[in-house]
Amino acid sequence: MRWQLHSPRRYAGAHSSMSNCPPPMSQVIIKTPAQLDLMRRAGQLLAQVFADLDSFIRPGVTTMQINDRAEAFIVNTLKARPASKGQYGFPYSLNTSVDHVVCHGIPKVDEVLKEGSIINVDITLEQGGYIADSSKMYGIGAISDEARRLVDTTYDALWKGIEQVRPGATLGDIGHAVQAHAEAAGYSVVREYCGHGIGQQMHEGPEVLHIGQRGMGMKLKPGMVFTIEPMINQGKRGTREMKDGWTVITRDHSLSAQWEHTVAVTEQGFEVLTLREEER
């Protein structure tokens, strides 16, 4: 679940204007090995939620049914808590963003998934006092080659960013890698929303932009944990928030895709705490 720049509302971070300068190091909470163990456990549980949804998400299912199934699985099977529910007044357990919805899509009882659509499912889970955050794209039935290329390019851009993570690298290295990969494919990077530090709170420092310059911004240190979650548009990068105060769409109604993982900086490089079985 991403952190919003510009606005103090909803998912906003502590900063009211977009900047290439992340929060100072004092706002970043370095996790101990014991805390990382708890976050790793939360991430493993979250991966199980997506595994449960993999065979459930298909044409004819409503986005509210996705919400209800995930919530039941988190609470009843995993004995954990859907961390998004109640956060900033959000009433549901996850976000469902279909086609030209960039992020923060609200589950609806009358939103039926149709053949050829794409959907991002964004879930947070808390157990043991620590939160994990991840999102995954699903193609509904057979999707177009154009939609598949966008989804795959966005996934690759996520990993280009993750692969930059190591002690001494900078946040700008991550943003540059994501941006360069997406723009080389002819796509645009959404700039109003970003990744964020995470731990006992859903949104901690630093802000992790998906654009940037190599060598710029905060240097990474072991024990930092944050999300990388690029939102990539097929058309122009402009977005617009809908009247419901949550849903964000592309201004030109082009398709948008997004993938997310929670990543820890280790002494050797990085660890993806929310890695799913098919990614191992």
Segments (PLM) and residue ranges:
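Active-site neighborhoods and metal-handling regions in enzymes and metal-associated proteins
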Residues: 3-11, 15, 19-280
